[in-house]
Amino acid sequence: MIQQESRLKVADNSGAREILVIKILGGSRVKTANIGDIIVATVKQATPGGVVKKGDVVKAVVVRTKYGTHRPDGSYIKFDENAAVIIGEDKSPKGTRIFGPVARELRDGNFMKIVSLAPEVL
């Protein structure tokens, strides 16, 4: 589960390495984010020459969580790290590559561009 002040690894080549969650979008009572949820975050670490810089406020979608998620068929999936992909206003990724696997739940949230760029969908 991702909550306010959580730090996430960035799984794309937008220039950010680590982000810190400011807000989870989706209503005032939403406390935690899971796979496929959109968050507002600030960049804490960035690579030089990237699209985003340290201190930028960005929107991102959660693609991997340690907490995991249950699926309707009864299976359960969780990852070794918490990771997100930085997105623009039109839900398209700011980077051109996605690193590591992403969950199949992103298809339900209309993040098909992220799913198509990912090397593996679990």
Swiss-Prot record:
GO BP terms, alphabetized: translation
The keyword Glycoprotein is annotated on this UniProt entry: no
PANTHER family cross-referenced by the UniProt entry: 50S/60S RIBOSOMAL PROTEIN L14/L23, LARGE RIBOSOMAL SUBUNIT PROTEIN UL14M
Signal sequence annotation: none
Keywords carried by this UniProt record: Ribonucleoprotein, Ribosomal protein, RNA-binding, rRNA-binding
NCBIfam families according to UniProt: rplN_bact
GO MF term list: large ribosomal subunit rRNA binding; structural constituent of ribosome
Name of the protein in question: Large ribosomal subunit protein uL14
GO CC, alphabetical: cytosolic large ribosomal subunit
Domain of life assignment: Bacteria
Family matches, as InterPro entries: Ribosomal_uL14 (IPR000218), Ribosomal_uL14_bac-type (IPR005745), Ribosomal_uL14_CS (IPR019972), Ribosomal_uL14_sf (IPR036853)
Organism of this sequence: Ligilactobacillus salivarius (strain UCC118) (Lactobacillus salivarius)
Self-association and partners: Part of the 50S ribosomal subunit. Forms a cluster with proteins L3 and L19. In the 70S ribosome, L14 and L19 interact and together make contacts with the 16S rRNA in bridges B5 and B8.
Biological role stated in the UniProt entry: Binds to 23S rRNA. Forms part of two intersubunit bridges in the 70S ribosome.
Pfam family, one: Ribosomal_L14
